[in-house]
């Protein structure tokens, strides 16, 4: 698994975890956030490794579908770029910096 995919899944999980079942949340959290192996998760839940794999793959697909429709992660990335551009334009002006900070905290 690539670092890029892991990072993307972590963001998608952050944005959409409230739409997942408790089992999906648990498997994804253990796999992506806590770096558990499929075997470790299977042992923890007394299921087969294949069952964990299937659940994670289905959940990944669901997260991608949510993103395709809601675009929360894409919009987050775009806002981040805008904040960075604004910071360059402020040229260290404290008032402008604090306004940008306030906007970022709203995210």
From Swiss-Prot:
It comes from the Bacteria. InterPro entries: RNA_pol_sigma_r3/r4-like, UPF0122, UPF0122_fam_protein, WH-like_DNA-bd_sf. Disulfide bonds: none annotated. It holds the Pfam family UPF0122. Might take part in the signal recognition particle (SRP) pathway. This is inferred from the conservation of its genetic proximity to ftsY/ffh. May be a regulatory protein. Belongs to the UPF0122 family. HAMAP family: UPF0122. This is UPF0122 protein BLi01817/BL02321. It comes from Bacillus licheniformis (strain ATCC 14580 / DSM 13 / JCM 2505 / CCUG 7422 / NBRC 12200 / NCIMB 9375 / NCTC 10341 / NRRL NRS-1264 / Gibson 46).
């Amino acid at each position: 698994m690539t670092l890029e995919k892991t990072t993307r899944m972590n963001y998608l999980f952050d944005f959409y975890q409230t739409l997942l079942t408790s089992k999906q949340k648990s498997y994804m959290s253990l796999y992506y956030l806590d770096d558990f192996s499929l075997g470790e998760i299977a042992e923890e839940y007394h299921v087969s490794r294949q069952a964990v794999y299937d659940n994670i793959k289905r959940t990944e697909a669901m997260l991608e579908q949510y993103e395709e429709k809601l675009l929360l992660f894409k919009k987050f990335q775009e806002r981040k770029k805008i904040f960075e551009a604004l910071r360059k334009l402020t040229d260290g002006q404290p008032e402008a910096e604090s306004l940008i900070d306030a906007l970022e905290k709203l995210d």
